Amino acid sequence: MTKNPYAWEKCKLGEVARFSKGSGYSKNDLVEHGKPIILYGRLYTNYQTIIDEIDTFTVEKNKSVISEGNEVLIPASGESAEEIARASAIEKSGIILGGDLNIIKILTKLSPHFLAITLSNGNQKLELSKKAQGKSVVHLRNSDLETVVLLHPTLPEQQKIGALFRRLDRLITLHKREWIKSPL
C-alpha cells in the first residue's frame, strides 16, 4: 500500500519544538526609539497571526531574550483560559521578547505561521484552554505546551495555508483602515 502524500501527520508539540520564556520587561521600560520589543500584552491588544511590524521599543538590558526568527509566541498568563489560547508567529530575528511569553522554536516539519494558526483555532485552542491553570489570573506553562497534539500536512501545504491566511489578514487590515478613514 502506498502512503498518501497528502495525509496529515499527528505528533506532540514537544516532539518537533523546543521551548523557552521571554525575560522581564514591562510597559514602563518602553521608549520612543530603541530596540524593538514584543511584550505579552501585544498578543491581546494588537493580535496578529504573524507579527511583522513592531511599534514598541526599549533599551536593551543584560540577559535579554532575543528572537532568532521563526518563533511562535503564546502568552504565559491572561485573564481567562480562552483568552490565553492564542499564538503569533514572529519571523524576524533581533526582536527582544519580553517576560510572560512562552516561546516555541520549531525544530522540524512545521511552518511557524501554520503552527500559530493551528494553536489559535479549533481543537488545539480548546486543548490549550483546558491546560490553562488559575482563577483570577490563568497561566500556561511550556510544560503544558509540550503535550499539545498537532495534526499537520506536509511543509509545502502548511506554507500554502499560511500564505492564504496572510492574504486574508492583509485584506482585513486594508478594509479596517478604509473604514477608519471613511466619514460617518
Task: Tell where the protein language model's regions lie, with residue ranges.
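Sequence-specific dsDNA recognition surfaces
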Residues: G14-S26, G41-G69
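Extracellular/lumenal glycan-associated surfaces
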Residues: Q159-L171, H175
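Structural detector for helix-capping/boundary residues
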Residues: C11-G14, G41, G122, S143
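A short glycine-rich beta-alpha junction/loop motif
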Residues: I95-N102, A132-P156
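Short, recurring structural edge motifs at helix starts
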Residues: M1-K3, Y25, V59, K135-V137, ...
